[in-house]
Amino acid sequence: MDVTADTSQKLPAELRYEAELARLREGDQDPKPAGWALSPRAVRRFILGDKALQVSRKFYGDDPLVDRCIVVLMGHQGLMLVGEPGTAKSLLSELLAAAISGNSRLVVQGSAGVIEDHLRYGWNYALLLAEGPSERALIPSPVLTAMQGGQIARIEELTRCAPEVQDAMISLLSEKTVAMPELGAGREVRAERGFNVIATANLRDLGVNEMSSALKRRFNFETVAPIADAAFEKELIARQVGERMAEYDLKADLPEDVLDVVVSVFRDLRTGRAEDGAVVAQPKSVMSTAEAVNVAHGALLDASYLSGDAPTGAHVARQLRGVVFKDDADDARKLRAYVDTIARARGRKSRAWAAFHKAAKDDD
């Protein structure tokens, strides 16, 4: 995997994987939709990986989902990615925008503070007072910039925006036009070919500001589910923890048995069923793969910088509390039950599980 050297904490995908994108562009002989930097096949290779071209896999899970998303973005409807928190909706959105437009930074972060100007345009008020309405005083939104350049705009957490803000999306997606009456009669921006919108919404938050039927019709909905394959999830966690640890001046990896503890704990508590079929009480907290990465990373940092020894299941147990004890006091009871039954039984056969069980009991 080629990663651009930079001291920034987080690079956008088009910079982080700049070398991979360059290789894909160089060898891309397939037909491209108007305005696309890569062909649909090359976009797929960028996201799902291509060993022959030394392109790393970046999205783990439902490969046909990626194909459907690419097809949607070639059409006239927007793409709406919905799912539980931590299922890589934003990651998939960023990767699609980086591959298709070469720019994943045209983003509006949905919240109660978003107003219609964030989707259309605003003004530099000093220039507005000095010169009156002019192109120099106008501040384009990320969506307007995407329309002008024929690029992908991203809207995160759309359902957190107020209904009147969501309604502004209807004309943008149907007419692909933004009127600018302040600049004169008939002044407008029409979207260049290649423009489209990727929005995301959490299933747990859909009731915050429910989308209207008219807006829903402008989007093609795709559900991003948690990773079904345990081996895929384990590979993803190991890879992302490795990328994070590359920021530190030390070489450290989670031992295989400790990584297995992380994956099993999260899958058991997420699904409500252990690997042997035993029923497990599910906490209300989101036991997502993203949280599993955070726990694994925290365990490795704890072992490397505080304990000064090899990571064990005990380090995992200490980091797990911050994930489970978030939304409901009853989640503590559910975790105790899991530790007293599932973890205890596994601890008789595994040192990593024994260490996890002991540390979890000590912290109780």
Briefly describe each language-model feature range.
Residues 234, 241-311:
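Conserved AAA+ ATPase small/helical "lid" subdomain
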Residues 218, 236, 298-301, 319:
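A general alpha-helix detector
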Residues 2-248, 253:
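AAA+ P-loop NTPase catalytic core and its hallmark functional loops
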Residues 304-364:
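C-terminal engagement/docking regions of AAA+ P-loop ATPases
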Residues 172, 265, 318-322:
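Short acidic/histidine-centered micro-motifs embedded in hydrophobic/aromatic stretches
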Residues 27, 243, 272, 345, ...:
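Surface-exposed polar/charged interaction patches
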Residues 67, 141, 163, 167, ...:
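Non-catalytic, well-ordered alpha-helical scaffold segments
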Residues 42, 142, 232, 236, ...:
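Exposed alpha-helical structural elements
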